[in-house]
Every structure is written in C-alpha cells, then in structure tokens.
Amino acid sequence: ILMFAHNGSLNRGCEAIVRSSSKIIKDTIPNSYVELASWRPETDKIIKDVDNFIDASPREIKPSFIEKARMFLELKLNKSEEYAQTQIHKATVDKIDDVDVCLSIGGDNYCYGEEQWLYTIDKNVKKKGKKLVLWACSIGEEDMTAKKLEDLKTFDLILARESLTHDMLKSKGLNNVKLVADPAFTMVKE
C-alpha cells in the first residue's frame, strides 16, 4: 500500500492521518507493507507502522530540447502539464508499479484550487491499473470545479471524513463515496 500526497509530519494533522492510517492498515491486514511518499520524509521517521519512506519531494527537472518541445506542445495543444508533472513527481509515479493500492492521504488537498500535480499522479495510478482511494477527505462545495470532479470520478473509492463532503460529492453524482470517521480519532494517547 502506498500512501501519497503527504507534505510531511511537521503538520500535526497530516502526521495524525499517517500515524492512525498506517496502524489501522497494519492491524487489519496481516503482513501488509505500507509505504509513505512524503515531501519531507525526515519528519515522518517517528511513525512506526510505516515500512518504507520515499522522498517524494517535487524534483527540479532539466528537460532536454525534445522534452521541452513535448511539454510546450502538450501545454499549447492539450492545455495539459501532465508530462512535466509526471517528471516532477517521478519518485511517487515510479513507486506505483510496486504496490497494489494507492491511498491519496492529503485529505484537504482538494480545497486548494486546481492541483494539476495531484490529478497527474491519480492518472498515473489508473494508467498502471492500480486501485486508487481518496482517504479521509474533506472538500467544500466552494472548492468543486469540473476538472476536480473529473478527477474524483477516477477513484475506486472516496472516503469522506464528514457528512458535508459525503453529501456534496453524492449530489455531484459520485457513487464511489462512503462516509467514515476521521482515522485520527483512533489514535491512542501517548
């Protein structure tokens, strides 16, 4: 299982989702192997139920002339940054091949406007024939766009952590949505 779209555990909410989710997975699925693609993996080493940490920080790309031409044409003709975003997020995209399920755990990422990098990773997950789950999300009606809705339709399962998100996504015609408690509520006090 690969958890991705995580900006590191300096944010206590992000840490809580990773810590609680990895424990839920380990407790529920014997012999599971949990990997975390993080933009700040050095902040995540404190989480004991993660088996492997991947440095998924966006990388600077130095495209060749041909790659620059490809990116330019893709942007001009298709209005897409998919090739460039795939290269920038290569560490996460390459890891998809090694797993069965990908959990997008940045539950609030869909509240920050159009996130082309996220849509690109999601497309790569589906292109590679893997299961894609949006884990413990919270999305407001005001955040919805046609592009975002198209991306959400590609998910095999969307787990909303509150009823407003659940009901709004259902009202948009998404049938892949379930209401669940925020996994952070399962954390044991240390």
Describe each PLM feature range.
Residues 1-141, 184, 190:
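Aromatic- and Gly/Pro-rich donor/ligand-binding loops
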Residues 144-190:
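A nucleotide-sugar donor-handling region in carbohydrate enzymes
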